């Protein structure tokens, strides 16, 4: 009994009993209600039997850092679009300057008069003739020509590279004195060796490019049944149109491989007349069907082979265009050369100093008519009065709208496209 009482007291102590009911039962007073502020009870001091399990708060997963969105590469602007945009930003003066190829006298430096024309009108292209080459120098004129072309470029009024041209055909038209002889067109035609023609013109182009010349006005693609009865003579490759085409295309390839533009001439053909367009306006009474069957064959093949330029002759073909010499004829330049043959390169007129042109129109009118017919580059040698007249005519025609901005830009784009082939310049 005594043991039972001891157990009961121990139980009361453990349970933190707060009192006893009248009927002798033990009453449990919860700890949160057993005491009052300031009153210490057994419930307040006794350790609880059970401790509530701690609430488990899961550690949040680290938020992944998103990969940065890569900046998309800008879409490259096609060169054709860049070129058109560049031309649209040029001044009229700069554009007109790209449409002329002028010459001057002198072998050492640009004359002061021509230097002023280059500066005033932003002349974009230059032609050299025999009078510019010191062929009697020990090296045949090459070193002095390199110095001359450097001076020419120093006078350029824009950062657009110049086309610097010359005509080296071989035979009687060589300009320099060549250490290793370059044979004439007739000899190439007689051998009918296209590979020999390609190698010769590749060598010519390499030598020209090394002295600062990037355009060769060659080869001659005129054909004639009897070349001796024409003023071109041995400059003609062959009386056979197929042979002339084959050798001519090889020459074009060689020039391009050597770093030069190739300008074939004299479209649509100078071989059916004995008259010299330097002195008079030749008249050739042949219809278009005859021309297509013979005279036009070498030109069509050269265009297909990728010739860079075509020079047009000052000859009247009344059965094709009774009102205009070929160089001023929309029929020849736009309908036939560009339309039928698909030519997209440069169209140059033969030298504007020639009587074959000047007997047909004033220089101002001729320059405008040439551009309107579809031409791109007006060529004029060392006559600075003529050059100013040409520039005056073109400037007035652009200002009064005779030559539209669209037509002007079209030719400038062609000229700049050609320049990119022989330089590292880009718009």
Model-predicted segments: where are they?
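Short, well-ordered coil/turn segments that N-cap beta-strands
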Residues: 98, 122-124, 158-162, 213-214, ...
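Sec-dependent signal peptide recognition
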Residues: 2-10
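N-terminal hydrophobic targeting/anchoring segments and the immediately downstream early-domain regions
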Residues: 18-56, 61, 66-177
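Generic hydrophobic/aromatic pocket-lining and core-packing "Φ" positions
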Residues: 114-115, 205, 248, 252, ...
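Phosphate/pyrophosphate-binding betaalpha-module
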Residues: 247-264, 290-307
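Mid-to-C-terminal alpha-helical segments outside catalytic/metal-binding sites
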Residues: 402-427
